Amino acid sequence: MHTCKMDHSKHTELVPMLQQRLRSSGPEGTPLGGRYGILLSFTGTVERDIVPHLLQLAERSLATSGCSRKEMKRVLFVTIEAVQNVIHHGYIDPSGDIALYLTLENTPIGFQVHCGNWMATSDAAALSERVSHLNSLNHAQLRKLYIDVLCNGEQSGNQGNAGLGLISMAKRTRGPIEFVAEPPKDGVQHVTLTATIEP
């Protein structure tokens, strides 16, 4: 994980900025009622001890959506890995905080987990490369890569080698993981990771 210099006065604005992005990130015209829509949204600073609480809220929301138990487990697993990825690689401000927004949405193509945060530019570039590599693999190749990393250990310096969490996420999404990074500013850039869990 990298740290970088940034105007300290801007750090207090990170969470409000994420809140604004969350409000503007949903598809236009999405109805509030009916089967589809946002089931869970969270914006704030994140620590390891908040993960169980987020999962509990996500599980309750999924239970009311009518999804199967098997599907719920897959969605919760992807949610865990998305948040853990932020904890491990997110930008840490001088106060020691990591800002995050997380949404869980039920869409016509499946459940979507959207996770947004700030990252140091070098970390964002490395994550983009890992996600791109995983998206190029089929399920059998992902399984082989998972076993290789599990047996040989994670070597983040190897090109194309991703951590077990990201590999597991890719295996469960049954589709490409979307990764969007905005232009960097002061060595930090906003990134959004979206994973779709198909029925």
Stretches found by the model and what they are:
Residues 56-80, 153-159:
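Conserved short strand/loop->alpha-helix "switch" segment adjacent to the catalytic nucleotide/phosphoryl-transfer site
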Residues 79-82, 115:
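Functionally constrained cores in energy, signaling, and assembly domains
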Residues 2-22, 27-41, 89-199:
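Conserved beta-strand-loop-beta-strand hairpin that lines the nucleotide-binding pocket
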Residues 38-52:
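STAS-typified acidic loop motif
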Residues 49, 70, 164:
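Charged, alpha-helix-enriched surfaces in structured cytosolic catalytic cores
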